[in-house]
């Protein structure tokens, strides 16, 4: 009998801790208006680094280090990738996986209804399936902050983004998310 009670206790205590994890992640997201961070991005083995700012909902500005002054900007509706080579790519944001990653309300709703997975005891992962997109979102197991994502990009490349050195709710310049003009 004691063995059965122990098993029940372990089952309910682990369920509570899983619910508590989700609650902490959701609370962190609710309290976050923007994040400034450094990133390392691996697209099919090609590593790029840089700095980004995300402002919820759906805005992002990234400067890539050592890559022809590459920038990535979303104003909430469109996504532009520009380099000084010159190349200029313009996409409707809603046709990219970033549309979901940059939508805090969407993330919160998905986290509420998705089973989390603990990876190596360090990371909390939510696998989100939406409109033919598979999006893996990762959070830190200690502070419950966003630490990265994995998607398939518009060219069908595996894209893994790790973020670090987060600064939350910084004062941002008004024109940060203005789309650059084509040369």
What is each PLM-predicted segment?
Residues 52-100, 159:
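An acidic-aromatic
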Residues 4-13:
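Sec-dependent N-terminal signal peptides
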Residues 109-110, 114-183:
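Gly/Pro-enriched, hydrophobic low-complexity segments
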Residues 27-47:
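A short, Trp-centered hydrophobic/proline-enriched beta-strand micro-motif
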Residues 94-113:
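A charged amphipathic helix-loop-strand protein-protein interaction module that recurs
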Residues 40-42, 63-65, 82-84, 129, ...:
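A generic structural motif
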Residues 34-37, 49-52, 62, 161-163:
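Extended beta-sheet lipid-handling architectures
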Residues 16-19:
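Boundary at the C-terminal end of the N-terminal hydrophobic targeting segment
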């Amino acid at each position: 009998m004691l063995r059965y009670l122990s098993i029940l206790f372990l089952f309910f205590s682990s369920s509570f801790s899983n619910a508590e994890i989700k609650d902490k992640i959701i609370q962190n997201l609710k309290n976050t208006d923007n994040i400034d961070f450094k990133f390392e991005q691996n697209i099919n083995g090609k590593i790029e680094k840089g700095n980004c700012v995300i402002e919820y909902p759906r805005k992002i500005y990234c400067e890539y280090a050592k890559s022809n002054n590459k920038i990535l900007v979303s104003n909430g509706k469109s996504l532009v990738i520009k380099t000084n080579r010159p190349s200029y790519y313009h996409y409707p944001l809603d046709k990219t996986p970033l549309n979901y990653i940059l939508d805090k309300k969407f993330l919160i709703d998905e986290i509420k209804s998705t089973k989390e997975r603990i990876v190596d005891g360090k990371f909390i992962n939510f696998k989100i399936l939406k409109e033919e997109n598979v999006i893996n979102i990762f959070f830190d197991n200690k502070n419950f902050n966003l630490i990265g994502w994995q998607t398939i990009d518009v060219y069908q490349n595996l894209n893994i983004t790790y973020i670090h050195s987060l600064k939350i709710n910084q004062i941002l310049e008004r024109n940060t998310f203005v789309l650059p003009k084509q040369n």
